[in-house]
Amino acid sequence: MDIKLKDFEGPLDLLLHLVSKYEVDIYDVPIVEVIEQYLAYIATLQAMRLEVAGEYMLMASQLMLIKSRNLLPKVVESNPIEDDPEMELLSQLEEYRRFKVLSEELANQHQERAKYFSKPKQEVIFEDAILLHDKSVMDLFLTFSQMMSQKQKELSNSQTVIEKEDYRIEDMMIVIERHFNLKKKTTLQEVFADCQTKSEMITLFLAMLELIKLHQITVEQDSNFSQVILRKEEK
């Protein structure tokens, strides 16, 4: 099964997507939380053996530096004019946000003009159509990456688990469907609650995408950071 997720245009685009979920001014976001979400996303891509561009890894190292500085006790700076990497990053994000808004406005104008001169290209955008409440597959993937990061922390504190490599998507689809034997909806947390390995979580996530693709389940999230609900499709 091919994994086709919406690509971000670069690390700043990914960060802006994460920041926008807080619906506050860029300079007011909880930066450590955003950094942890970014790092979880990169770690999940690597766990799924997906290629991660060098620029994303470079940004990850910069974010780890900012995170470590934020977690250290606050002290009076002996050199107040020293560059602040966090403020530099937030300034870059704000500049990128303004640029992106302008680019989208220009693109919309171009599309409006194109309607009068050419027949629009027919496309089926799977990732932006299958989830409800304006959520995309990428939003679901970001939520999953945070869950996997938390699950790995839990597993690392428990007994050693031997990785099993022969999980099958078809089997995991059945596992998910069992959650709907006695009810019409469940949560993402409930679906992944019994996972014991990273491979199991990844295969279960791919099985969920396949069920969505087959219109057997729908995924809902009423607001940013709220529970993700899986609902059985009515026949």
Swiss-Prot record:
Q: Where in the cell is it found?
A: Cytoplasm
Q: What is the superkingdom listed in this entry's lineage?
A: Bacteria
Q: Name the Pfam families on file.
A: SMC_ScpA
Q: Which GO terms describe its cellular component?
A: cytoplasm
Tell me which InterPro entries the record gives: ScpA
Please tell me where this protein is predominantly located: cytoplasm
Give the record's GO biological process terms. Answer: cell division; chromosome segregation; DNA replication
- UniProt keyword terms in alphabetical order: Cell cycle, Cell division, Chromosome partition, Cytoplasm
Role according to the record: Participates in chromosomal partition during cell division. May act via the formation of a condensin-like complex containing Smc and ScpB that pull DNA away from mid-cell into both cell halves.
Family, per entry: Belongs to the ScpA family.
The entry describes its oligomerization and partners as: Component of a cohesin-like complex composed of ScpA, ScpB and the Smc homodimer, in which ScpA and ScpB bind to the head domain of Smc. The presence of the three proteins is required for the association of the complex with DNA.
Can you name this protein? Segregation and condensation protein A
Query: Can you name the source organism?
Result: Streptococcus agalactiae serotype V (strain ATCC BAA-611 / 2603 V/R)
Gene from which the chain derives: scpA
